[in-house]
Regions:
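N-terminal Rossmann NAD(P)H-binding glycine-rich loop of SDR-like oxidoreductase domains
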Residues: 3-25
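NAD(P)H-binding glycine-rich loop region in Rossmannoid oxidoreductase-like domains
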Residues: 36, 46-90
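SDR active-site strand-loop-helix element
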Residues: 6, 30, 69-75, 111-117
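Residues at the starts of beta-strands that form the adenosine-phosphate
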Residues: 2, 26-27, 109-110
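Active-site helix of classical SDR
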Residues: 144-148
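Conserved Rossmann-fold NAD(P)-dependent oxidoreductase catalytic core, especially the SDR/UDP-sugar
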Residues: 96-142
């Protein structure tokens, strides 16, 4: 299967890529050109396309022809500094670009869009008694990464 992973150099993206490469799939990563981890990913046996999530043409070219898209790419705390507008353009408009490009891709079978734990409180005042389920905690972002 042809798989595209945005955010391939991130903690989760790297592990998703390794998993599908080990299963013999054709994995391509879409990454920001300034990402210093690109070369590391090439060593795992995947192709890397550089571009910007907020640029629809870049996103459309990356999505085209893939059967599966995992969208995990985002401007994040340690990648910046980013302004509030940059967080919005990259994270929100970038996600819309992924959705729009996916609609234009007749080969696409699956689109997986992820979020972040930056939208929930990481250290509640009271200890957690049970594992966290999807709708257990209110959204409680504390920075522009979480907001976007």
């Amino acid at each position: 299967m042809k798989i595209l992973i945005t955010g391939i150099t991130g903690r989760i993206g790297t592990n998703v890529a390794k998993h599908f490469i080990n299963l013999g799939h054709d994995v391509t990563g879409f990454s920001w050109s300034k990402d210093q981890k690109i070369e590391k990913m090439k060593n795992f046996g995947c192709k890397i396309i550089t571009g910007d999530l907020e640029n629809f043409d870049d996103v459309n070219k990356a999505v085209k022809g893939n059967e599966v898209v995992f969208h995990m790419g985002a401007a994040f705390q340690s990648g910046g500094p980013f302004s509030p507008n940059q967080y919005f353009d990259i994270n929100v408009k970038g996600t819309f670009n992924i959705l729009e490009a996916s609609l234009n891709n007749n080969n696409l079978k699956h689109l997986v869009v992820t979020s972040t734990d930056g939208t929930i409180p990481k250290y509640p005042k009271k200890r957690l008694e049970y594992p966290i389920a999807e709708f257990d905690l209110p959204q409680n972002a504390t920075d522009w990464y979480g907001y976007s």
